[in-house]
Amino acid sequence: MKAHKIFSIKVFCSIILFLSHNLIYCASEDPIYGKNGMVVSTSNEASLVGVNILKKGGNAIDAAVAVGFALAVTSSGNGNIGGGGFLVARMASGASFTLDHREAAPKKSKRDMFLNSNGNVIPGMSLGTRASSGVPGTVDGLLRVFYDYGSGSV
């Protein structure tokens, strides 16, 4: 019985792997390379916003910020202003930087705010109440990187 179960699991995993073959690899079998820059996102409209920024003399940071805000409108499930993120960048000068603009706990949050007087977790308190909210970091992060590393020309 046990050997049959293991065999069934192996067959199931093999089928899933076979069916997900197209999901594992890139959408195009022939990679596309840009000669003067490239903008890629989950939304054609948002990518075009970034391309237009580059054409107007903006740098990659300007384009990334514009795409980030455009995604909040054109592809809100993939880019939104109610969350946060991470940015890793290398500028043309060779300088690199990172920015953590993830959501943060509200300022009045306390380390033990989800615990009762005995120090035990209050069930559901950290999931389904106003106390469980976080402060989005997307807008602050995009604006901060724009002002600190943008070209200043758009």
Model-derived segments and their meaning:
Residues 1-7:
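N-terminal secretory signal peptides that target proteins for export/translocation
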Residues 5, 22-23, 117:
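Short linear motifs in intrinsically disordered/low-complexity regions
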Residues 10-22:
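Bacterial N-terminal signal peptides
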Residues 26-48, 52, 60-154:
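Noncatalytic scaffold domains of N-terminal-nucleophile
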